[in-house]
């Protein structure tokens, strides 16, 4: 049975709808919470069969409000990448993936948007990525994938919404399994919130079925390319 290492950066942001897809395939995962008093960034030995780096709420990586464990997490992601193990980065996690794989980040204010991402590679996620999908983004700063990365999908402004590095490393600016309750908890968890989050919350709530439907092929492609179902 596969075992994944999942790093949280806030109490509110977790795997969300992705949990059911992993559990349904008997893929185990363990949350690590470096932001708690007793929490630390896990050692490489704890990565197991793959690393998932989640979003950071108001935390970023471009220097304005860096997540406190940024250096350690970039080092862990780099070691995981160099070992050939799969990595999934979401939001802040995608920024960490970019930094660990010779990309960069650019400064951007904390934003909360629910827009449509558009696939740009027909074979994205082994052909399973939907042609378009709802892309809920709650993030400060933005990942800039390395030049050798493959852009899988773009946001309405043309910036990357999803990218792939090598065979089994992926970054998503939005959370493919985001729930309205998670966004509400992020708003309540921190003093700093995106401006006027109400409309985005409503839009996220109305899109819940579309998000759940798109997640089915997205997870199918991720699991296939990461090999998490192979013995």
Q: What residues fall within each predicted segment?
A:
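Extreme N-terminal starter segment of soluble prokaryotic enzymes
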Residues: 1-5
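Cofactor-binding loop segments of dinucleotide-utilizing enzymes, especially the Rossmann-like FAD-
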Residues: 7-9, 34, 92, 174
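Short N-terminal binding/cap micro-motifs at the start of the first secondary-structure element
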Residues: 12-17
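Flexible gly/pro-rich beta->alpha loop and the following alpha-helix that scaffold active-site loops
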Residues: 23-88
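Catalytic nucleophile loop
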Residues: 79-104
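Pocket-forming structural segment of enzyme catalytic cores
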Residues: 99-181
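Acyltransferase
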Residues: 178-231
């Amino acid at each position: 049975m596969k075992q994944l290492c999942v790093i949280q950066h806030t109490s509110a942001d977790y795997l969300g709808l992705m949990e059911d897809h992993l559990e349904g395939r008997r893929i185990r995962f363990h949350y690590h919470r470096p932001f708690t008093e007793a929490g630390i960034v896990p050692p490489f030995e704890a990565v197991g069969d793959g690393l998932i780096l989640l979003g950071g709420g108001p935390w970023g990586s471009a220097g304005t409000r860096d997540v406190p464990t940024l250096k350690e997490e970039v080092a862990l992601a780099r070691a995981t990448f160099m070992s050939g193990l799969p990595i999934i980065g979401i939001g802040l996690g995608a920024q960490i993936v970019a930094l660990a794989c010779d990309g960069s980040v650019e400064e951007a204010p904390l934003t909360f948007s629910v827009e449509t991402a558009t696939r740009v590679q027909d074979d994205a996620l082994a052909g399973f990525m939907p042609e378009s999908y709802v892309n809920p983004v709650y993030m400060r700063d933005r990942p800039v994938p390395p030049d050798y990365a493959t852009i899988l999908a773009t946001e309405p402004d043309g910036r990357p919404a999803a990218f792939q590095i090598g065979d089994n490393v992926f970054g998503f600016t939005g959370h493919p399994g985001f729930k309205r309750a998670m966004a509400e908890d992020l708003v309540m968890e921190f003093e700093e919130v995106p401006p006027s989050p109400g409309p985005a919350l409503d839009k996220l709530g109305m899109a819940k079925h579309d998000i759940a439907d798109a997640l089915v092929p997205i997870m199918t492609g991720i699991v296939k390319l990461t090999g998490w179902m192979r013995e």
